[in-house]
């Protein structure tokens, strides 16, 4: 059974025993975004899913704006709080962006890397950071909390075949985010550009993308996997951006294979 833990700075959900797997959610998620992975992977591993700093029950980063450097440090500190020297790191969307920096700047913490529905840099298709930021900040500026617009946002980024139960779980995850925390994350995401750093990643890496992902499309995943020395790319048919719940069985099986391969080396 999963246990919720409120640490001094970071709160997380944990299940299982064994080697540590940590799960880093995306911009509109929280620790409950990972229910299918907690259930599936905890039969063989100790699995922990955090609330991003400032999200859910986690304290915000102290001082200054949210940056990827600070988030990577927070992730490294959290792994230490869990009593581990290293972990299999799984991230989705913004969480997979954080994972890239974690693997570069804190390589001793990362036994393996799984990057879902993400990008090596913001705006590879020419998207204007200012326009993207303005569109996502608009409902917050109008006084709407994330819970009020979660359904609209999630349906827009999901593939056409997501079931209502999976969508409901993601709505509940997004409802746990404060407007202030979401605003800080939006400002952070537009600064993402790990491309000059990716060749330094030495951890075995699995990159997965949904065939129908319009937020971080397959072309982004090809650039990402091509820039990491020990990376494998898997495209999931008929899935959108909410990959871990839209194609949970496929994702869980791929992660399990990846971790087994790493541990058998």
Regions found by a protein language model. Give the residues of each.
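Gly/Ala-rich beta-loop-alpha elbow adjacent to hydrolase catalytic centers
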Residues: 91, 95, 99
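Acidic catalytic loop of the alpha/beta-hydrolase fold
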Residues: 211-216
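Catalytic active-site module of serine/aspartate enzymes centered on a nucleophile-bearing elbow/loop
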Residues: 231-265
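Conserved alpha/beta-hydrolase catalytic His-Asp/Glu region
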Residues: 124-130, 143-199
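Flexible "cap/lid" loop of the alpha/beta hydrolase fold
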Residues: 100-105, 111-142
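Conserved acidic catalytic loop of the alpha/beta-hydrolase fold
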Residues: 70-87
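Conserved HGGG/HGGXW glycine-rich cap/lid loop of the alpha/beta-hydrolase fold
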Residues: 8-61
